[in-house]
From Swiss-Prot:
It comes from the Bacteria. This is Protein-tyrosine phosphatase RolB. Disulfide bonds: none annotated. The gene is rolB. It catalyses: O-phospho-L-tyrosyl-[protein] + H2O = L-tyrosyl-[protein] + phosphate. Keywords: Hydrolase, Plasmid, Protein phosphatase. Induces differentiation and growth of neoplastic roots (hairy roots). Seems to function as a tyrosine phosphatase. GO terms for molecular function: protein tyrosine phosphatase activity. Its EC number is 3.1.3.48. It comes from Rhizobium rhizogenes (Agrobacterium rhizogenes). InterPro entries: Glycosidase (IPR006064). The keyword DNA-binding does not apply. Pfam families: RolB_RolC.
Amino acid sequence: MDPKLLFLPRFQPVDLTPAWSQINLFEGIRFAFAIYSRDYSKPLLHFQKRWALAVLDLKENSPPIYILKQLAELLKNKVCYHPPMFVSQPDLARENDQHVFVYLSREKMQKVLKEQSITFGMEAVLATTIQPYRSELALQEMLRVHNLAWPHSRTEEPDLECFIAIFASSLFIHLLELKVTNVYGREVACTFFLRRGTENRPYDVVACGTTQFTKNALGISRPAASSPEPDLTLRLSGPDQEGEEGVMKPAAVNLKKEA
């Protein structure tokens, strides 16, 4: 049997463009990552193993087949975020899953979804742990940290309109840790990762949609110390809290009814 016929269709991104609130987007992203991990990655690894065994059984040892056999040895045990390719460094799953977000313009997002690739030419991919539902973060602050993290590629406001959610592969390197200040004056820690350009290469996108960063932070009054506004920051739950370790949980919010 032709080894390439043993592979599953690639994962179809969950479209979260209709998400109309912070909580809806939070839940949608969590659901999308869970679907990939629970319902897709396990059968994908099973099919990868079958493909790898078929390749390793080939009697031919020409240079292309030798490269495929090297790849097969890797794909036997690690989920790969793209189909088998003649590459020496595939995008493999990390030892511990790392959820990251790549921010981009609407036009660029449509291109990513159409071509099923996050890399174009030798352009680097900048990803961050800052989630797109963080409506307490100002667009201007997001621009500042993105340009601080990777000044080699200027980020403009349209580049933060949309997002794609992905698992960071083994080719994403830890770039730096930064802190962003939300509209209430609180600091929020974040991490940036960078993947160097490797020409156009397919990559599984988990979810996509539009961001909810605050566009007019100047119009938001900061809370008085004696009567703070509800903290809308979505925190990481610790081991002693309910829910899975490391899963983002929304803080309790008491909304006031309009008169």
